[in-house]
């Protein structure tokens, strides 16, 4: 108690010193609080998907480097040949800006191309309507899934939004699903999203550009079966890679590398945050 009274007397006699001390404490406490919020959000908070520990990130790896992307034909082959996963989905490596027509003026929104059942793979069902099915994976498909924000802002949260039309890049699409509020695709920290992804369009796997194996532009995500291990799934994918290399010589230096989804998303920032917290 005596020390506290002495400290108050010192600060009363030296207001400038007191201001510096208070400012330093305020900055230190604020920085610590902010850093804890970042660490809690990145490292401690579970991924916003059902049973995220079963989710696996798959990316193409060559002898000399990792490409982090897979070609559409390879995705189709892996999806049809593997039995280690409940489901296997894919999405474009980055979203793209599209123009959506409105009554007032055209609006620019972010859209991502995704495969059938990607939302189901993540364990997040649309709040209304359905996920994409394989029949949607064609150039002629006009199905679209919209975000909760688009449903609210552009359709007023209408109960009958499923089946309504929306014009995207001068093409008329039919809304087949609405994602829950707060849903995000698992882009890793190498993709800096300046705007949320509000539209989800189906991959057109029969498009001529999607038939070229040397064009790698997909990210693959799988949900392991309950009885499967990551090691066994990796071994099975290695076997499929060798089978494909025997048919497609350009694939002879290529294979899939599997890592837990959480490790891929937060792995590269974990050491930096740990150092900052320690300091």
Name every feature range the model reports, one short phrase each.
Residues 1-27, 268:
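N-terminal Sec/SRP start-transfer signal
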Residues 27-54, 61, 72-75:
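Alpha-helical transmembrane segments
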Residues 53-55, 84-87, 173:
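Loop/turn elements at helix/coil->beta-strand transitions in domains of secreted/extracellular proteins
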Residues 21-24, 170, 279:
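Residue-level recognition of transmembrane alpha-helices
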Residues 265-279:
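N-terminal membrane-entry
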Residues 96-97, 110-133, 142-269:
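Mid-to-C-terminal secondary-structure elements
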Residues 2, 6, 13, 41, ...:
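Generic recognition of well-ordered alpha-helical segments
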Residues 61, 65-87:
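Extracytoplasmic/periplasmic
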């Amino acid at each position: 108690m005596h020390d506290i009274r002495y400290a108050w007397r010192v600060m009363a006699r030296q207001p400038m010193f007191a201001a510096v001390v208070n400012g330093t404490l305020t900055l230190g406490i604020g920085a610590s609080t902010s850093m804890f919020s970042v660490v809690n959000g990145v490292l401690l908070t579970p991924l916003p998907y059902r049973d995220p520990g079963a989710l696996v990130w798959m990316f193409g790896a060559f002898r000399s480097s990792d490409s982090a992307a897979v070609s559409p034909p390879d995705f189709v082959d892996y999806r049809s040949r593997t039995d280690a996963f409940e489901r296997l989905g894919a999405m474009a490596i980055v979203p793209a800006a599209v123009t959506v027509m409105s009554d007032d003026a055209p609006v620019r929104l972010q859209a991502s191309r995704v495969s059938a059942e990607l939302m189901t793979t993540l364990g997040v069902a649309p709040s209304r309507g359905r996920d994409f099915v394989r029949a949607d994976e064609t150039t002629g498909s006009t199905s679209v899934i919209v975000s909760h924000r688009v449903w609210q802002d552009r359709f007023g949260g209408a109960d009958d939004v499923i089946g309504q039309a929306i014009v995207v890049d001068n093409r008329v699409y039919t809304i087949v699903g609405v994602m829950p509020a707060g849903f995000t695709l698992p882009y890793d920290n190498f993709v800096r999203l300046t705007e949320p992804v509000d539209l989800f369009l189906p991959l057109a796997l029969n498009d001529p550009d999607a038939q070229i194996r040397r064009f790698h532009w997909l990210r693959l995500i799988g949900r392991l079966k309950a009885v499967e291990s990551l090691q066994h799934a990796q071994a099975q994918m290695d076997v499929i890679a060798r089978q494909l290399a025997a048919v497609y010589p350009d694939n002879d230096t290529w294979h899939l590398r599997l890592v837990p989804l959480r490790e891929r998303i937060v792995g590269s920032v974990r050491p930096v945050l740990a150092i900052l917290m320690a300091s």
